[in-house]
């Protein structure tokens, strides 16, 4: 009986997602699953010398800040 109970507990732990992982958009396209310590998605707008706009997207452990950067903390929020 103890073996059966232990087996059920182990299977429950294995099948459950015990940690939440954030998903963000990344460059050039697609998505990425952030590392455990990366709790924010960011989108940074960079103006090139030819006045083209470049969007840098990804995961971060903190918001880089600045007027050209937007940060958020929910899945796929940095579109």
From Swiss-Prot:
<feature type="disulfide bond">
    <location>
        <begin position="34"/>
        <end position="59"/>
    </location>
</feature>
<dbReference type="InterPro" id="IPR003571">
    <property type="entry name" value="Snake_3FTx"/>
</dbReference>
<dbReference type="GO" id="GO:0090729">
    <property type="term" value="F:toxin activity"/>
</dbReference>
<feature type="disulfide bond">
    <location>
        <begin position="72"/>
        <end position="77"/>
    </location>
</feature>
<keyword id="KW-0800">Toxin</keyword>
<feature type="signal peptide">
    <location>
        <begin position="1"/>
        <end position="23"/>
    </location>
</feature>
<keyword id="KW-1015">Disulfide bond</keyword>
<feature type="disulfide bond">
    <location>
        <begin position="24"/>
        <end position="41"/>
    </location>
</feature>
<keyword id="KW-0964">Secreted</keyword>
<comment type="similarity">
    <text>Belongs to the three-finger toxin family. Short-chain subfamily.</text>
</comment>
<dbReference type="InterPro" id="IPR045860">
    <property type="entry name" value="Snake_toxin-like_sf"/>
</dbReference>
<feature type="disulfide bond">
    <location>
        <begin position="63"/>
        <end position="71"/>
    </location>
</feature>
<protein>
    <recommendedName>
        <fullName>Toxin 3FTx-Oxy5</fullName>
    </recommendedName>
</protein>
<keyword id="KW-0732">Signal</keyword>
<dbReference type="GO" id="GO:0005576">
    <property type="term" value="C:extracellular region"/>
</dbReference>
